[in-house]
C-alpha cells in the first residue's frame, strides 16, 4: 500500500486524487492533507479518509478545523498551519508519494521539500516548472526523488516515452532513445473558429465555454488564448529535456489524443482517453502498475473522426509569446506567468478586452528585465514585480 500526502486536497486535482483513493482503498492510504482555508471540505475529507496530519494555510482556519474535528470525535488528528508545516508534511518519513497540487506560488516550497526528501512527486503545480524549472530540475538531480507529471498532456507524453526516459525524466537525451519529437496537443479552445475581427468583442462567457473540459474560469480563458498550451510547452521543455526542435504543438479539437511522441523509425505513439483528470492521476499514483480510475472507457465507435491543424499564431499570440519567453530564460517565463494572471483577472472583471491579454503580457515581458533567479525567493521577487507592472500597465488599456 502506497502512503500519500496531498498538497492542495480541497482543490480540483486534490478532490480527484481522493476519488482515486476512494476507488482503490486497498492500494493507497492518506497520511496528510494540506489545503488553504476551506474548513468545510477539509472536515469532510478528514471524516472519510482519517489522515494523521492536516495543515491549513493560516492559524485561523486551523483553529476552526480543530474545534470541528473535536466536536466530531476526530480530535486525534494533528492540525497544523502555515507554509513551514506544509513543507514538513511533504517530507514525512512515512510518506511514499506527494501529490503537488497547490495552485500558484504557495505550492513551490512544499513541492521542493518533497523533492529534497526523495519522494515520488506527482506534479500538478504548473508554477513549479514555469517559474522554477531550472531550480527544480537541479534539486531533482541532487536527490533520489522521482517526478511524475499529472497534466493530461505531460502524462500522455510520459506514457508514450521509452521506460529508460521515464526513469531519467528531465535528464535523458531524447535522440539517444530514438525520440525525434514531442507532440503537444491542444483543443484550440472555444474561439478556434471565431473570425479574428470579432476577437475584440469576446466576452468572458464566450471565452469560458470550453468545448471538452470542465474547468475553472481562469484556465478556461487560458485555453481560449492558448496560454495554457504555452505554459505546458515551457513545462514540457523542462520535464522531457527537450530542445525547441524536439517540440511540436498542434491543435486537436476533439481532445481525445492527449499528446504524442514521434520516433525516428516513423512510429508515432499516442495516449488516448476521455477528458477526465482522474486518468492521469490514477496512472501516476499507481505507476508502474495500473488501477481503476473510475473514468468511462473510450468508445471508439461513438467517438467519430479526429482532426488536426497547425496553430495560427495570429489567433494565439500568447502561445508564441510563451515559446519566445522560454528561449529568454526563467525570469521571462516567471514574468509572463504573473502578468497573465493579472491580465486574465482584469478581462474577467471587464477591465480588459480579450485581445488586450496578449498585448499586456508582451509589454510586461519586454519591459521587465531581471537577472536570472538562483533561488525560490528570487523567483518570487520577479513574480511580484511583474504583477505590479501588469497592474500599472493594465490601467492604460481602456475598454
Swiss-Prot record:
Binding site for Mn(2+): 151, 153, 232
EC number(s) from the headed UniProt entry: 1.1.1.267
Task of the protein: Catalyzes the NADPH-dependent rearrangement and reduction of 1-deoxy-D-xylulose-5-phosphate (DXP) to 2-C-methyl-D-erythritol 4-phosphate (MEP).
GO molecular function (one): NADPH binding
Source species of the chain: Edwardsiella ictaluri (strain 93-146)
Keyword Nucleotide-binding: no
Catalytic activity: 2-C-methyl-D-erythritol 4-phosphate + NADP(+) = 1-deoxy-D-xylulose 5-phosphate + NADPH + H(+)
Protein name as it appears in the record: 1-deoxy-D-xylulose 5-phosphate reductoisomerase
NCBIfam families listed in its UniProt record: Dxr, PRK05447.1-1, PRK12464.1
Keyword hit for Oxidoreductase: yes
Cofactor: Mg(2+); Mn(2+)
Gene3D superfamilies found in the cross-reference section: 1.10.1740.10, NAD(P)-binding Rossmann-like Domain (3.40.50.720)
Class of enzymatic activity (EC top level): oxidoreductase
Gene: dxr
Complexes and interactors: Homodimer.
